[in-house]
Amino acid sequence: KPSDELLNLWNHQVEMSEVLTSRADAISASEPHRAVMLVMADRLDATVRRNADTMYRSADDFLADLRIVQRSLADAGAPRAAYGPVQTLIWQVETFGFHMVEMEFRQHSLVHTRALADLREHGRHGDLAPMTREVLDTFRAIGSIQKRYGEKMAHRYIISFTKSAQHVADVYELAQLAFAHPEDVPALDVIPLFEQLEDL
């Protein structure tokens, strides 16, 4: 017997897309867990195709659905399914999300300093140096990657030859300047590298 939690998930799926749920119900009318998983599989396909109507917004949303299925299977007396293939899939999503590797970005602190000086002199829409434009484009690329694949795919930003906390602040300021709207600024985990003893 499916749990109330699983039935609520199914009802949510019906509200989201009657097309997906009617197809799953036709295949697995007497198997509610399988029907829910079929819709989840269709939503994963929609995520790959960037179908905004039914796609998963994040790997965490997919993980939450998986855990509902797992708990319901366990409560229904199917621990082998709950803690076998479903658990394996949960581990994979926890490890990789919707991607296989995490990207890291790295730039010298002096490049940031020069880019900020250039921006202060010419403004964001002025005649900027190629290196400044490249720095801004990097933050825009990070934002695009996060929107498409999730924050965990690209959030680490390494500053080489960091000498002070100001160099960390520079990164956040540049990230803000790269976007016209604050909500588009990507989340960043800035990692300063102090590569000279006197800077430690």
Where are these regions (language model features)?
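Extended, charge-enriched "interface" segments that sit outside catalytic cores
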Residues: 2-148
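Core mixed alpha/beta domains of very large multi-subunit molecular machines
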Residues: 112-117, 121-191, 196, 200
